Amino acid sequence: MFEARLDMFRNRLVKVYRHLGRQARRQGIECYRLYDHDLPEFPIRIELYGEQVYLSEYKRYHGMSEEVHEQWLDAVYQVIAEILELSTDRIYGKLRQRK
């Protein structure tokens, strides 16, 4: 169901990580924002802190059941772990919502 969109997200993340990662290494920076809601289908923010990843998900209507949403979120974690070459236990997530 969401596999085609995951490929789009994967491609975007690879492109951004290549560019920003190279720039950060050159400048000796370990903490930076990698992704900030670039694609509307992925309302998340990804920040790198050395070997740790902080993922913020923006709460919004997504039209998915809770079960499908959990599968989607797990798939997002897998894509991030694959591209950054980290295990998923180094990815910390939070749901952000308006008060």
Give a label for each model feature.
Residues 57-67:
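A short interface-forming secondary-structure element
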Residues 1-52, 58-60:
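Non-catalytic accessory regions of SAM-dependent methyltransferases
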Residues 45-47, 71-99:
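Non-catalytic substrate-recognition/targeting regions of SAM-dependent transferases
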Residues 5, 9, 68-76:
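Short amphipathic alpha-helical segments
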Residues 39-41, 66, 70:
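N-terminal, helix-rich and Lys/Arg-enriched segments in bacterial and organellar proteins
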Residues 52-55, 74-76:
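Short, low-complexity, polar/charged sequence segments that are solvent-exposed and flexible
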